[in-house]
């Protein structure tokens, strides 16, 4: 039973990631969010919350962070229309520093 639950959570996390990526591309009118990429989503076991990891290509992270936090209710309401869940998880946006570190390491290695 535990494996089925974790598989379901992983599947829903991936679905949330895909839907958020689509929402950022199609419905967000703020140009500062055009460089935001969703890298991963980790939903809690009870699906009450989800951590959304993102990176930024164009804008500064400090500019994008409060915008995403304010828009989390909008994203949650849009997700509720596409996800077939009783309760849509609350979204928390977290900057993904690991992907930036990886890009920096690749850049340094390419210089060698």
Swiss-Prot record:
<dbReference type="GO" id="GO:0005829">
    <property type="term" value="C:cytosol"/>
</dbReference>
<dbReference type="InterPro" id="IPR000238">
    <property type="entry name" value="RbfA"/>
</dbReference>
<keyword id="KW-0690">Ribosome biogenesis</keyword>
<keyword id="KW-0963">Cytoplasm</keyword>
<comment type="similarity">
    <text>Belongs to the RbfA family.</text>
</comment>
<protein>
    <recommendedName>
        <fullName>Ribosome-binding factor A</fullName>
    </recommendedName>
</protein>
<comment type="subunit">
    <text>Monomer. Binds 30S ribosomal subunits, but not 50S ribosomal subunits or 70S ribosomes.</text>
</comment>
<dbReference type="InterPro" id="IPR023799">
    <property type="entry name" value="RbfA_dom_sf"/>
</dbReference>
<dbReference type="Pfam" id="PF02033">
    <property type="entry name" value="RBFA"/>
</dbReference>
<dbReference type="GO" id="GO:0043024">
    <property type="term" value="F:ribosomal small subunit binding"/>
</dbReference>
<dbReference type="InterPro" id="IPR020053">
    <property type="entry name" value="Ribosome-bd_factorA_CS"/>
</dbReference>
<dbReference type="InterPro" id="IPR015946">
    <property type="entry name" value="KH_dom-like_a/b"/>
</dbReference>
<comment type="function">
    <text>One of several proteins that assist in the late maturation steps of the functional core of the 30S ribosomal subunit. Associates with free 30S ribosomal subunits (but not with 30S subunits that are part of 70S ribosomes or polysomes). Required for efficient processing of 16S rRNA. May interact with the 5'-terminal helix region of 16S rRNA.</text>
</comment>
<dbReference type="GO" id="GO:0030490">
    <property type="term" value="P:maturation of SSU-rRNA"/>
</dbReference>
